[in-house]
Amino acid sequence: MDGYAVRVADLLSASQTQPVTLRVAQVLPAGVASTHVLQPGEAARIMTGAMLPEGADAIVPFEEAERLPYEDQHDERCIIRRASRLSDHVRAAGADIAAGAVVAAKGRELTAYDLALLASLGVAHVNVGRVPRVAVFSTG
């Protein structure tokens, strides 16, 4: 879910009439792990597939927030007009595949889908075998 990773505690009083403004402390593209611990009053702009930064416990979709114009990238802010609940729009690691499940059986020809799935599971290397070439010569 593309949006802002937030601390639910910062948004307890957020409403249409009492919006909360948060400083955007970092931007997290897909596949990137955060090195910053989200502090009170901060949010992180996060893309689908990125790991939730430490300190964040929910995501507010971009469609439910307002990005304020800024001149300096260190001064980016967002306005949120509703309270958020714990784990809103957050999918836990491994939630889509059970531990120990076979995701690519031996002998299967790997597709782009398989490689994306393996990458999303943190599999960086896969042992593969070459399809054998066989020729039959009939001699009589």
PLM segments and residue spans:
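Polyanion/phosphate-binding surface patch
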Residues: M1
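Short, glycine/charged-enriched hinge/interface segments at domain edges or termini
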Residues: Y4-G140
